[in-house]
């Protein structure tokens, strides 16, 4: 799967870059001659190309989760969250809050960053309240770290509680979702002999729980 994903990625990204460049040139050269509908269609073309690019990147990441060697070091989860908040899209009405102090764990820095980034990116775009909140917390047991990520978003129907961890399964904001993020999360947690589950109420929000073995 990994080798196939890399080949497909290379073959698909080249024409995508060409389409993106052509759309940009058309917009720059003819925006004064196009009507509002024409300009809108070119912008939509760019957005669809960007969405396809994200999908390809997601497939690549999914294909490499199990093949990469885990380089376990001391990982400060507080620092990971801080770094993620600096790079992901967070709507103005949403805040990400850390409840207490998160631990320093023995894990692969890249994988833990990938894990939380997928969780948080998924959470912030599915909040429909005027004031959106995402809360991150952690509890310690003798063998595991148990993390929770709670949001006051749209909620997830019961019938999707298992499906969303499978590749290409998504609900809610389909424009921003590739259907890969939570499947990557599941594979990373599996590598740390952990479990993942959720509690959700439609219109109230969702809390994801997951464990990572010490």
Segments the model singles out, each with a brief description of its role:
Residues 47-52:
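Short alpha-helical segment of the dimerization/phosphotransfer core of two-component systems
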Residues 66-70, 100, 104-107:
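Conserved micro-motifs of the catalytic ATP-binding
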Residues 161, 181, 185:
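Short alpha-helical Gxxx[C/S/T] motif in the catalytic ATP-binding
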Residues 193-199:
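Glycine-rich ATP-binding loops of the HATPase_c
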Residues 156-168:
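Short conserved segment of the HATPase_c
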Residues 189-190:
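Detector for a conserved hydrophobic position within an alpha-helical segment of the HATPase_c
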Residues 117-118, 122-123:
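Conserved polar catalytic motif of the HATPase_c/GHKL fold
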Residues 133-143:
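Short beta-strand/loop element within the Bergerat-fold HATPase_c
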